[in-house]
Regions:
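Membrane-embedded transmembrane alpha-helical bundles that form the catalytic cores
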Residues: 1, 9-270
Length: 270
């Protein structure tokens, strides 16, 4: 009987692992179709933070001060990548204006994609921002910080960690998922009751209403018209359009978040 229970548990764990690997492969393919070569950046971040988190845990278990240095390395790598892709133009322009230099941002990914040729050396205003970079970088940072604080143990299997980082419903537009909330669900059997199915459909429809009915309607029928020709409208109408723009941004992100929550629930994650 005990042997049968062990075999049953082993089979269940194998099915869970295969499910996670399949969803991770789908997520990577999804990101490749939206971002192309920037999939390499996602894979690099996944590998580096998985390795660093394990070093942090080992150092903490020995009460070594190296844990802080490993955490600092993780933060430097993640924030360095974020600053490079999001703020390289800004800082380069500031330096050029102050010092009269002619520095340009070197686009490594364009260089690789162009076959290691000089055509990959883009000017300052040519570098492309990877899709969802802010979300997955802050997510892996929250993971290493949680490991350092002892809120979660490091993931042993890199494929499971890769799934946590790249899960496609929240990869592009969030929400950012905390490791101590999501990772335990990787090893939980799939369960979707009638109530959870109905709740998931509600979240998806709620997000679609926010996005299509509210956000897109405001953008097309009010905000774009006023912003394109502000002098044709009164001061009150311009002010109203500014408030409507804030509502549009909220409805966009909130709608995407609701849709991501609903899709994740349909797959057994909530």
């Amino acid at each position: 009987k005990a042997k049968g229970e062990r075999l049953q548990a082993k089979g269940r764990n194998t099915r869970l692992h295969l499910r996670n690997v399949f969803l991770m492969a789908v997520s990577w393919f999804f990101y490749y179709k939206t971002s192309g070569l920037f999939l390499l950046l996602l894979l690099f971040v996944t590998l580096s933070d998985w390795l660093i988190a394990r070093r942090i845990y080992e150092a903490k278990s020995r009460e070594s001060k190296l844990a802080k240095w490993w955490l600092a390395l993780s933060v430097i790598i993640d924030l360095g990548l974020l600053c490079y892709f999001k703020y390289a133009y800004f800082f380069t322009n500031v330096v050029n204006d102050l010092l009269g230099t002619e520095f340009a941002v070197f686009d490594l990914f364009a260089y690789i994609g162009n076959g290691f040729s000089e055509s990959g050396r883009f000017m300052v205003d040519s570098i492309i921002l990877p899709v969802g970079i802010s979300f997955y970088l802050f997510q892996v940072m929250s993971y290493t910080i949680d490991v350092y604080r002892g809120h979660v143990q490091p993931v042993k299997n890199i494929l499971d960690f890769g799934f946590y980082v790249s899960f496609f419903p929240q990869l592009v537009a969030g929400p950012i998922v905390r490791a101590n909330e999501f990772i335990p669900q990787l090893y939980r059997p799939f369960r979707l009751s009638r109530r959870l199915f109905g709740l998931a459909i509600f979240w998806v429809l709620n997000g679609l209403i926010k996005k299509i009915v509210l956000s897109d309607y405001l953008a097309v029928n009010l905000i774009d018209r006023v912003f394109e020709n502000p002098l044709l409208f009164s001061g009150f109408e311009n002010l109203f359009a500014l408030f409507a723009y804030s509502l549009q941004v909220y409805a966009d992100f909130s709608g995407y978040t609701d849709i991501a929550i609903g899709i994740a629930m349909l797959m057994g994650f909530y």
